[in-house]
Amino acid sequence: MDNLQLWQRYQDWLYYHPNLELYLDVSRIPFDEAFLKGLEAKFERAFQDMAALEQGAIANPDEQRMVGHYWLRAPELAPNQELRDEITEPIAQIKEFVKKIHSGAIKPPNRAKFSHILCVGIGGSALGPQFVAEALSPLNPPLEIAFIDNTDPKGIDRTLAHLPLATTLVIVTSKSGGTPEARNGMLEVRNAYEKLDLDFPQHAVAVTMPGSQLDKYAQDWLTRFPMQDWVGGRTSELSAVGLLPAALQGIDIDEMLAGAKEMDMATRVHNLKKNPSALLALAWYHEGKGKGEKDMVILPYKDSLYLFSRYLQQLVMESLGKEKDLDGNKVYQGIAVYGNKGSTDQHAYVQQLREGVPNFFATFIEVLKDRQGDSIEVETGSTAGDFLSGLLQGTRQALYENSRHSITITIPEVTPRQVGALIALYERAVSFYASLVNINAYHQPGVEAGKKAAASILDLQRKIVQVVRETGTSLDLATLAAKIGASDQVEAIYKIVRHLNANRRSLTITGDLSKPETLQISTR
């Protein structure tokens, strides 16, 4: 197409939401009328599936659960009053708690106020709050925020070293209450408080399902906030998981919810051209041929949105990365997601995007307003923001000229309302795409398999230590494996004892480290 034809296609396929001032441009995805015609039946089913989901149908058949994260911003849509109360009551509880924290009515022992927040959680319990904090936290928030989102001891130490624990409020988030990484982080943090003779329960709150292990453990903490059974971790940002830390930072959570609600309403339209999430799903389906054959590269041209790609990585990949479809057929679905920010990425991997393997499609996120206040001219007639805009437009054009396709999302500025809308836009797109390819977007059997494998390694470690202690002499790896009845697990045993030796715990190894078969394992 020449430039005038492209301009006409842009106008033909431009979506604009007047209340949100959000634009979605899929004109650089080269689908045609025949392609659209072939998807009509699939999209009609997708629209019906979404309507049924919102009405309370079992959308997660593996776990026999409803999927209700869309109700979080529209409680009136929940199927019954009990569910509506499960949404509205925690929001009221959050607002009251935050008011008391900010005023000092709830304060740490022997201090005037809390000054910092430490969020302990992993996956959806961290990625959403981290994204929102980076995008929306004010320059001088009422409380500064930090995160422990891994079970890495050195990382935990580094985070704790930068916090005034005496005035730090700890939020421990775990839906089940038994996630090892969140539990480990909580125990490490509690230990740090106790070493300083600080009363950990008077600094801690929990976000978890009622009746969970964490809920029971946290009964003497400042308070507990509920997570709902029908909200998954990766779609929990607009539940207490994300709203509590956001509100504590002074972010307007009502505006976040309002933006998401506006977007949800727009995506209930059974008209492809007028439904932005359906348009996104269409573009994804076209680019990957319905099989995830191309990666999704997220390029927000705004520093405050640089964590959006990490947030979307979990939302998209954990939802769509499935071995089997709903009929039990092996399909190996999924879309790989990565990205950082523009224009930084133009000095990193855009070279490959332009001239390397064409195994991706890009999503540019444009923010129209450069900053609060005026900008200086860095060249005659041009500001730094003009350069950023020019680099986005230039990169989009350069990619298109080499048959690299792209989507562009444009918002006026980064506000709570816009962030809520972006979250909803992608949540709904994931749901539509999942319907198009007939998969369950709301379970994660691969994650559970990884957890079980990790548990088996820890069980093997306990057996290793016990056998070496009971034997009383040094053992080589093969003999040790045989003694614990795991002759086929020599490699795993080797890696376990190597780790224990490096941390000077329980066991020691001697011998030629370059030749594992020569190593002798004994008690330390």
From Swiss-Prot:
The keyword Isomerase applies. SUPFAM superfamilies: SIS domain. The keyword NADP does not apply. It is an enzyme of class 5 (isomerase). One of its GO terms (molecular function) is monosaccharide binding. The active site is at residues 318, 347, 451. Pathway: Carbohydrate biosynthesis; gluconeogenesis; Carbohydrate degradation; glycolysis; D-glyceraldehyde 3-phosphate and glycerone phosphate from D-glucose: step 2/4. It comes from the Bacteria. One of its GO terms (cellular component) is cytosol. Keywords: Cytoplasm, Gluconeogenesis, Glycolysis, Isomerase. It is found in: Cytoplasm. One of its GO terms (biological process) is glucose 6-phosphate metabolic process. Its EC number is 5.3.1.9. It catalyses: alpha-D-glucose 6-phosphate = beta-D-fructose 6-phosphate. Belongs to the GPI family. HAMAP family: G6P_isomerase. Catalyzes the reversible isomerization of glucose-6-phosphate to fructose-6-phosphate. NCBIfam families: PRK14096.1. This is Glucose-6-phosphate isomerase. The gene is pgi.
